[in-house]
A protein has these predicted regions:
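Sigma70-family region 2
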Residues: 87-91, 163-164, 217
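Solvent-exposed, amphipathic alpha-helical segments
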Residues: 128-142, 180-191, 235, 239-242
Length: 310
């Protein structure tokens, strides 16, 4: 890089960190999420009260832990136990980037029996789990919906513990899974704007939160937050057809805002709420047809191109 006089300037260093606090269900316990990108930053020796679960997403980091050195590279998972001193910094000149979550120990005991889990190896190679953790972290950092956070993070942490710790897994089969799912569906649909936490539902059913999640997934094939989002989309359709605007509809069906509604509406139906409303309102003969997201992108890409003579 050069300035106006032609002198070489050093590259801009990136030292970025952003904290997001998600809540696991309505009035539930907090779960802190860190998104970090550092070129030179080196942590002082420290410890956390929580388990630190990190996924490296760029560069490489050297972590001093338990008297040794861990080298985290993209796709690797690092698990640091509560109360254990560690530090970290760049392994090379390209810095390092990672996503981390800070989980109370109780969160990692829901899918096991006996003593709390112990991770003999702090550096884990599990590409599928790393990708799932990264995706959940990214999406919940952008829009920390309580039910979605409670549906996704305890499930992923259970997978982490069951695959990689010394703890003994709890039973997989949940008797009466269909009945459990029916109760959960009814409660979520009945309290659309402020759904109950899964922890409270599990207590009412005499289950752990992990057992409730497993039962629901067994019966429905999707987690509770995804079922509720689809139910909200169907309710939103009816309200849009009645003439209400997307911004009004979002709050009425329990989405955080119009952007949250739009994200799920497109996932389920392939179009935006505004486009759907335009197409289905009564008396709008000749209205533009509803286009899928791909068709909308194609039309925008083609706008402005000269038309060929016929």
């Amino acid at each position: 890089m050069t300035d106006n006089a032609g002198a070489v300037q050093p590259p801009t260093r990136r030292e970025e960190a952003r904290w997001t606090r998600a809540t696991l269900g309505r009035d539930g316990q907090p779960l802190d999420l860190l998104t970090a990108r550092f070129d030179r930053h080196r942590y002082a020796p420290h410890a956390h009260d929580e388990f630190t679960i990190g996924v490296c997403v760029g560069g490489s980091e050297i972590i001093d832990y338990r008297g040794g050195h861990i080298r985290a590279v993209p796709g690797s998972i690092v698990v640091l136990a509560p109360g254990e001193i560690h530090t970290g910094g760049p392994a090379a000149c390209d810095g390092y980037a990672y996503r981390a979550l800070y989980a109370q120990p109780s969160l990692l005991t829901e899918a096991v029996v006996g003593p709390p889990p112990h991770f003999r190896e702090p550096l884990l190679d599990d590409p599928a789990l790393a990708a799932a953790l990264r995706t959940a972290h990214t999406e919940l950092s952008a829009c920390p919906d309580p039910l979605e956070a409670e549906s996704r993070f305890p499930w992923l942490l259970a997978a982490l513990v069951r695959r990689h710790s010394t703890a003994r897994p709890d039973r997989d089969e949940i008797p009466g899974a269909a009945g459990v799912a029916a109760v959960v569906r009814d409660r979520l649909a009945g309290e659309l704007q402020a759904p109950p936490s899964l922890a409270d539902l599990a207590t009412d059913l005499g289950l752990s939160r992990y057992q409730l999640l497993r039962a629901f997934r067994t019966a429905e094939g999707i987690p509770p937050y995804a079922w509720l989002a689809q139910h909200r989309v169907q309710r939103a359709r009816r309200l849009l057809e009645s003439g209400l605007r997307p911004a009004e509809v979002a709050g009425l069906v329990g989405f955080a805002d119009q952007a949250h509604l739009t994200r799920w509406f497109r996932r389920v139906l392939g179009v935006t709420p505004a486009a759907y409303r335009t197409s289905v309102l009564p008396g709008r003969q000749g209205a533009a047809p509803v286009l899928t997201a791909a068709q909308q992108r194609s039309r925008r890409a083609g706008a402005g191109r000269p038309r060929l003579p016929v």
